[in-house]
């Protein structure tokens, strides 16, 4: 906000943030600020959702980077925040509890090369997190090597776990063959929304549909996971989704 105030008289580089703020301001919803990540951000109808990242160390780590980038805006009129590899450390990892069912959504979070106080290392060494055993895991960062640690995954996943992930096809393709093999070794019940080795024909409708300024993806399928009364997970695939074992 301080950076926004300083550049308001010049060019407004924070239009998206301000638009979102104004939309929320004009609604009747309450905006809660959580001081303790041990409290759920949602708790109703037997469903609890916890945000377990980013932490205070991440705030401090990224604050220095954002200040440096904001300085470029103020003094050099740059129009882009170039966070590079560090961008993913601000990812919001979610724990969802539905009765006895435990789900972990990994977002795009990665392991930092040297700093164990941020990223996945900080989460996995947290005592409260270590109490969890997850039934379903949304693999972070499209199954990249920098998001995976076999020891940690084995520790926080249940024996009959289900893994699901989405590929990345812009630039370097993720997951690569090495990581596909590794993830299959960790969990035989792993699924991906599309096979990057295949080319999918565009449907005419998808050439016209747009979401904002981006085209909707035409190659991804869906991975639907349900649980019966005994807590057993059942996986239903649609579209171009396939078991990772077929790759």
Q: Model-predicted segments: where are they?
A:
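Short, charged, surface-exposed secondary-structure boundary motifs
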Residues: 172-176, 201-204
């Amino acid at each position: 906000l301080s950076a926004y105030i300083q550049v308001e008289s010049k060019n407004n580089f924070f239009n998206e943030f301000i638009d979102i703020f104004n939309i929320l301001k004009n609604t009747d919803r309450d905006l809660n600020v959580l001081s303790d990540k041990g409290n759920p951000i949602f708790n109703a109808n037997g469903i609890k959702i916890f945000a377990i990242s980013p932490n205070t160390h991440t705030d401090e780590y990224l604050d220095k980077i954002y200040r440096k980038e904001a300085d470029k805006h103020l003094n050099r009129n740059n129009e882009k925040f170039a966070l590079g590899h560090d961008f993913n450390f601000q990812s919001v990892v979610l724990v969802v509890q539905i009765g006895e069912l435990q789900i972990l959504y990994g977002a795009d979070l990665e392991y930092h090369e040297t700093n164990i106080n941020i990223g996945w290392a900080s989460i996995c060494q947290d005592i409260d997190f270590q109490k969890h055993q997850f039934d379903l895991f949304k693999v972070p960062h499209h199954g990249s090597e920098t998001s995976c640690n076999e020891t940690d995954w084995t520790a926080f996943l249940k024996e009959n776990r289900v893994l699901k992930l989405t590929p990345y096809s812009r630039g370097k393709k993720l997951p690569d063959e090495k990581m596909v093999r590794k993830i299959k070794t960790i969990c035989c019940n792993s699924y991906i929304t599309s096979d990057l080795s295949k080319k999918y024909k565009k449907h005419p409708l998808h050439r016209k549909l747009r979401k904002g300024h981006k085209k909707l993806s035409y190659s991804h399928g869906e991975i639907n996971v349900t649980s019966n009364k005994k807590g057993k997970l059942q996986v239903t695939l649609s579209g171009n989704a396939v078991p990772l074992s077929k790759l």
